[in-house]
Amino acid sequence: MSLFDLGGKTAIVTGAAGLLGRQHCQALAEAGAFVVATDSDRDTCAAVAEALGKSGIAIAADVTDPVSLRQLADAVRSLTGRIDVLVNNAAINDKFENPAAALEDSRFENYPLEMWKRSLEVNVTGVFLCSQVIGADMARAGRGSIINVASTYGVVAPDQSLYRDPEGRQRFYKTPVYPTTKGAVLAFTRFLAAYWGGAGVRVNALSPGGVENGQDDFFVAEYSRRTPLGRMAAPTDFRGAVVYLASDASGYMTGANLLVDGGFTAI
């Protein structure tokens, strides 16, 4: 349908080499957009762009560095003459290097300040900077759609019982920083939607539910049991939502949070 057609438009996707970033790039390209796959690792984002063929290119950038982002925006405008869509997808989620210490290290009382600061830098400051540098170009042009990737954990608190083993022992805790940063992204989305509404730039959030990605069978079953649709998301389940938010199909939608979670937050 023409409402969903992104032909002639240029989209930048940050965190393009990640599990969902790859899918966002593919979905936008299939809808007709020229996609700029952006990640901190040049080789991995090059592989993503290669899969897009003539519909994409890779440009490495650091979302926490405004100089790097200015270079990215200038390069894209020199190449295509426009920026129509920005998908703020880059984020980090805690991984503990020592599984044996994960239980104690992930407790709120013990959570390392360094990990807190690093996640804030990428997950919140990165979204702020990308929007400030790249989104400002869109506002000056009087058009565009910004999609901030948040999470169900920005809406509801983690159920820590999900992270127990089959015997009921806590394996680790979902740490405080990921829900905190995703909640901040949702608040920032509303701010920016109101701020740039008159400039023709729409700003919405996409909040995915849990994505199946090699978790053990017990976790998958427990998560699925808490979801009305009875399963975790597949990485491809968010393609339609990204195209919808990027396209004219959502032309009267801004400041909203599109939950794609199989009903996880409904119960």
Q: Which residues does each PLM region occupy?
A:
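Conserved glycine-rich Rossmann-like NAD(P)H-binding loop of the short-chain dehydrogenase/reductase
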Residues: 33-47
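Substrate-binding pocket helix/loop in short-chain dehydrogenase/reductase
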Residues: 97-108, 112-117, 160, 223
